[in-house]
């Protein structure tokens, strides 16, 4: 039986996530499978992979052919690095302990790079949020200035109107006070 390691689609419309499965070559994409060895969610940044490393290595060593995407996932997770090192052990190039040490060094280097990437993404997200907040504050200050100018103009117009009305009202009162004095 020819086997493939491939992705099986799950999730709703426009939000796909995948199960990594071992399936017969002739089985349909979302059909019958032999074993589920992990999940892959491309919607997160960076993509989230949950993989049963031992079973994936077992199936790769048995000759299961991965699809292109799964091959990239397995490569990033280190399955192919481990296979390469085990091939070196089988040929006698180095011992299994040396192979394990090389694999751990590679894995630690990979994880530190991933942590750096996540930190950089978080920093960029914080900087973007801060820039948005500053821009919003600037816009709010401009709006507040315009509102203050408008209120000041309205107050000045109201004061002028009151000033214009006040002498007009005082003038007849003054005339009224002068008239009884003459009489």
UniProtKB/Swiss-Prot annotation:
It comes from the Bacteria. The keyword Ribosomal protein applies. Residues 149-183 are annotated as: Disordered. The keyword Lyase does not apply. It holds the Pfam family Ribosomal_S16. GO terms for molecular function: structural constituent of ribosome. Residues 162-183 have a biased composition (Low complexity). Residues 149-161 have a biased composition (Basic and acidic residues). Belongs to the bacterial ribosomal protein bS16 family. This is Small ribosomal subunit protein bS16.
């Amino acid at each position: 039986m020819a086997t493939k390691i491939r992705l099986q689609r799950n999730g709703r419309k426009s939000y796909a996530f995948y199960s990594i499965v071992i399936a017969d070559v002739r089985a349909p994409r979302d059909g019958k499978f032999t074993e589920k060895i992990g999940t892959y969610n491309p919607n997160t940044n960076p993509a989230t992979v949950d993989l049963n490393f031992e079973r994936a290595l077992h199936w790769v060593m048995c000759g299961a052919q991965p699809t292109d995407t799964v091959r990239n996932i397995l490569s990033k997770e280190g399955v192919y690095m481990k296979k390469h090192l085990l091939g070196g052990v089988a040929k006698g190039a180095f011992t299994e302990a040396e192979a394990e040490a090389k694999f751990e060094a590679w894995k630690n280097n990979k994880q530190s790079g991933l942590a750096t990437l996540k930190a950089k993404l978080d920093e960029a997200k914080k900087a973007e949020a801060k820039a948005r907040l500053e821009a919003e504050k600037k816009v709010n200050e401009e709006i507040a200035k315009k509102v203050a100018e408008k209120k000041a103009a309205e107050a000045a117009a109201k004061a002028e109107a009151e000033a214009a009305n006040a002498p007009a009202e005082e003038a007849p009162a003054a005339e009224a006070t002068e008239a009884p004095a003459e009489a």
